[in-house]
Structure formats: C-alpha cells, structure tokens
C-alpha cells in the first residue's frame, strides 16, 4: 500500500553532497548521535547538530540528542552505552577516527546491537598521512562483525543509507555504511531524495520492540559483559551464525522495497553490461560510475564485457554473488581501493577467489585510487585489455606509473565523453573564492533548470 502511494508522488530533486545525503537520511532513524569530527566526515556531524538545534524531528517525533565527545573512542563508547540503554544511536567518522573505534566495534557486534556508522572512507596514515579517500580504514574493520554496506554516488548514498538503519534493527546486526571520502562525500549532485515518510514506514516495529526489550533496566536486570572461559566462549561465539546467515536476505528485501519506492534498482550485487559477457570487472564505491561508462563504450564496439558493483560486502553472500554473474563469464578482474601489505591479494579479491573456488573462471586482482588517485575510463579499458592478454598481470595497479615493481598497466588514449555533456575545469588560488563560486553555480543550475549538474572540488 505504501509503495503504491509513493509511486504516485512527485519526485523531490535537491542539490547536496554525499555527506548531507547520508546525514539527512540517517536523522529520522537516530535518537542519540555521539560525534567527534574528522575530515572528510565532519559535515555529517555538523549537519546533524544544526538540525537538532533547529528542532527537526526524527521518526519518533523527537529531536536527536547530540553529544560531542573528547575523541572518536569516546564517541563510539557513548554509542555503545546508548544502545545498551535501548536507544537507536548513530555516529560518523573516517580514517584514524575509525581506527580508535575498532575495539568497541567488536563489542557492539558481539552483543548484536543495531548501531550504524556512516563513514566517509579515507586513507589511514602509513608512511605519511593523507586526508583523501580510499578503503583502507573500512577494510581494517572487516573482522569486527559489523555489516559493511557500500555506496558509490550521492544518489546511492541517499537511497541506501536508510537500508543500513532498517536492516540493523531487523537483522539485529550493526552496520557500517561507507562511501568514498571527498569523491562522494564532497561531490555536489542533483539527487532524487527518497520520500522520508515512505522510507521510515519500512522500519520493523516488532524488531524495534525486541531491541528495546533487551535494554538494561533495573526492573528486569540481566548479566552482561562477562569474562568467559573456554568451556562456553567458543560455542557462544558460533551461536551468532544464524543472524549473519540471514542478514543478506534481510538487506536484499529492504533494497527491493527501496527500489520500489525510488524506481532505481538495487541489489547486494548490481550487474551492468552485456548479458553474455565473458570479461567482468568487480569493484565497489565511486569507481562504479567510471566502470559503467567504460563498459557502455566497449559494448558499443561489440566487446562482451560487464561490471559487477558490490553493495553488501559483509556478510559476503556467495548465493547472491554467484547469481549476479553472467553464466558466460570466463575472466574476472577485481579492483581493490586499498593496499594489503604482505598479503597474496587485497580483501575483495580474496573474497571473490574464495567464492569462485572450484570454477574454471580466471580471477586476477589489482589496486586503484589510493589517496583519491583519479581513475578514468581509459584505465578501466586497460584492465579489460589486461584480462584478455596472453599473460595477464596479476596484482596490477592503475592510475600510476610503477617504475619500481613494474605492476602498472599501460593505458591507451580513450575518449567516452557524451557529446551532450558540458565539462568545465576551474583553477583558483586560496582565498580567491573559486570553490565558493562553483558551489553556488552548480546549485543555481540544478535548482533553476532541468539540467543535472555535478561538481567536485
């Protein structure tokens, strides 16, 4: 009934960046937000604070209670405490801030509390610090027990951020929703904002009541946070398997409902390209739009290629993954936006290899986009060309010229620009106002014309 009403609604186009999209769609599901700002996630906390101060109501008719802590460790500790008391709690972070949260993430996941973290994923400092985006921070969390949900554009952030909250409550598993720092978090775009009432109506009230009933309460005290010995710890750790096994179907169901509301199709794994593709690239995040652009150009040339975008990375559902691939696929290249030093391959590559164990499909892996290194369609074409080479390079890189270990792929000139698209590049010095002027310009174009304008700084 809700879906029928929503389909008849007029689309609501707004201009915002990825941070605002995440914060806007998270606010209705949040009762307590504990924050500590860190680039590039800070605007999410700032917007939540501003909306709360102005009296914006969540789905329960309350303003969000927001507290800034002394550090990210304090923020996640406050989130943990709020969840134990039966309040839906959210925080926002990146990079080193997320690293400080990891010890508590294990506890929250082990206790199956429906926390939600929205992460503008960013490089973790190694030989040097960097404020720019890749997946190294998120990949450090993949063993915590948090579900990992990836989005690749401002529109996807707006559409799928609610799925993290909805599935966390119904599945009784905490979620970390991540999108690329700066490339998505700070990209301004024209988005069709999902109807808030329709989305919040999807919240499972019975699951919410069950969560509230588990809250610490002196009227019905419970024993928690015990120190266990080997006689019971192993068994109790395995006892959570059923919740993780069921979660992919919970997320897929919510994605189907969001798809019905928005008219945009979402799955755990979204395939794009030739239905009879023999060569497929697998990746997640903002590179997805670049990959689709390259696939369109190559399919138009008669090549049988495709792209598989990963949305739900943890739990990794082999059932949904295998069902998403064309039956004709022979070769796969997996792109990871991180560097796993000392490993035989990066995280997504290793998961794909495990999922395809026993099949004749050739799988190779590569790295791209560390510290927001740009990835263009020509580089994606180079990956497809490498796949069909007589001796393809495994463990390759794109976007750089590797003159040390010689793992970078050669890139040929490739133009795929839509002739109806206008692209402009502006240069300016600090304090000249170039960025501010472009912020205003793109909003004016989006809000006063039927055109779709995108800006990235």
Name each model feature, range by range.
Residues 2-140, 145, 162, 392-395, ...:
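Thiamine diphosphate
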Residues 50-55, 293-307, 357-358, 443-451:
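Short helix-loop-beta junction
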Residues 60-64, 175-270:
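Conformationally flexible catalytic loops at phosphate/diphosphate-handling active centers
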Residues 92-93, 116-120, 150, 176-180, ...:
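Short beta-strand segments
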Residues 131-181, 205, 354, 358-369:
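Conserved thiamine diphosphate
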Residues 275-303, 316-321:
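Redox- and metal-dependent alpha/beta enzyme cores, enriched for Fe-S-associated oxidoreductases
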Residues 301-331:
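Core nucleotide-handling region used for phosphoryl-transfer chemistry
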Residues 331-417:
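Peripheral docking tails and interdomain loops at the edges
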């Amino acid at each position: 009934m809700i879906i029928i009403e929503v389909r008849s609604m007029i689309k609501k186009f707004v201009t915002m960046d990825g941070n605002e999209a995440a914060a806007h769609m998270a606010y209705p599901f949040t009762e307590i937000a504990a924050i500590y700002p860190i680039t590039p996630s800070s605007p999410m906390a700032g917007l939540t604070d501003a909306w709360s101060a102005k009296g914006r109501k969540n789905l329960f008719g309350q303003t969000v209670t927001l507290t800034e802590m002394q550090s990210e460790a304090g923020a996640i500790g406050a989130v943990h405490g709020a969840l134990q008391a039966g309040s839906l709690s959210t925080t926002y972070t990146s990079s080193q801030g997320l690293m400080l949260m990891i010890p508590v993430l294990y506890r929250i996941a082990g206790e199956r509390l429906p926390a939600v973290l929205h992460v503008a994923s960013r490089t973790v400092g190694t030989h040097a610090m960097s404020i720019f985006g890749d997946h190294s921070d998120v990949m450090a969390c993949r063993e915590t027990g948090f579900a990992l949900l990836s989005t690749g554009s401002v529109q996807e952030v707006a559409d799928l951020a609610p799925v993290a909250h909805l599935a966390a409550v119904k599945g009784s598993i905490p979620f970390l929703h991540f999108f690329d720092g700066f490339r998505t978090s700070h990209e301004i775009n024209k988005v069709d904002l999902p109807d808030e009432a329709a989305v919040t109506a999807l919240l499972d009230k019975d699951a919410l009541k069950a969560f509230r009933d588990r809250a610490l309460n002196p009227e019905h005290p419970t024993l928690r946070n015990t120190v266990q010995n080997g006689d019971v710890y192993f068994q109790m750790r395995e006892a959570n398997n059923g919740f993780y096994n069921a979660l992919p179907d919970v997320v897929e169901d919510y994605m189907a409902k969001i798809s019905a509301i928005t008219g945009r199709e979402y799955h755990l794994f979204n395939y794009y390209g030739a239905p009879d593709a023999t060569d497929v690239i697998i990746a997640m995040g903002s590179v997805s739009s670049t990959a689709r652009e390259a696939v369109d150009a190559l399919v138009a040339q008669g090549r049988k290629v495709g792209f598989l975008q990963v949305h739900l990375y943890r739990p990794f559902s082999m059932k949904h993954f295998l069902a998403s691939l064309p039956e004709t696929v022979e070769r796969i290249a997996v792109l990871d936006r991180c560097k796993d030093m000392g490993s035989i391959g990066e995280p997504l590559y290793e998961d794909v290899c495990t999922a395809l164990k026993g099949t004749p499909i050739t799988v190779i892996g590569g790295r791209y986009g560390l510290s927001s290194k740009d990835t263009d369609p020509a580089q994606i074409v180079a990956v497809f060309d490498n796949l069909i080479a007589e001796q393809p390079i495994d463990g390759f890189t794109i976007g750089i010229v590797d003159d040390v270990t010689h793992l970078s792929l050669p890139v040929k000139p490739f133009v795929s620009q839509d002739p109806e698209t206008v692209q402009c590049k502006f240069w300016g010095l600090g304090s000249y106002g170039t960025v501010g002027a472009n912020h205003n310009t793109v909003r004016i174009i989006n809000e006063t014309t039927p055109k779709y304008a995108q800006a990235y700084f």
